[in-house]
Amino acid sequence: MNCYEHTIIAKQDLQESQVKKIIEKYETLIKKNSGKIIKTEEWGLRNFARKIKNNRKGFYFHIKFDGSGKTIEELERAENIDEMLIRYLTVRVKKHDFEENFFEKKDS
């Protein structure tokens, strides 16, 4: 199995319950396709530098998981037809980094 990091951006006009359902949907999809969830992070509502598909903001989620090519194939197939999503990105990494969350608010 390979290590992956997957980021999803969902539309800004979703309610909190819809956001939770999206996360659960894709976590379940990863598990059903022989993947193993390592960590899921909600980065919250963030502004875009420019409009993307007529949206100025989006909800960001980040999932770290172990999986195979089949897992990625099924994940991205489902995301292509999901109208609640704006963008997604899957990156293969050598190992999962647990040291720092770049979007975590830090106290000064």
Task: Kindly label every feature range from the protein language model.
Residues 2-108:
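Structured, basic alpha/beta domains of bacterial-type, RNA-associated proteins
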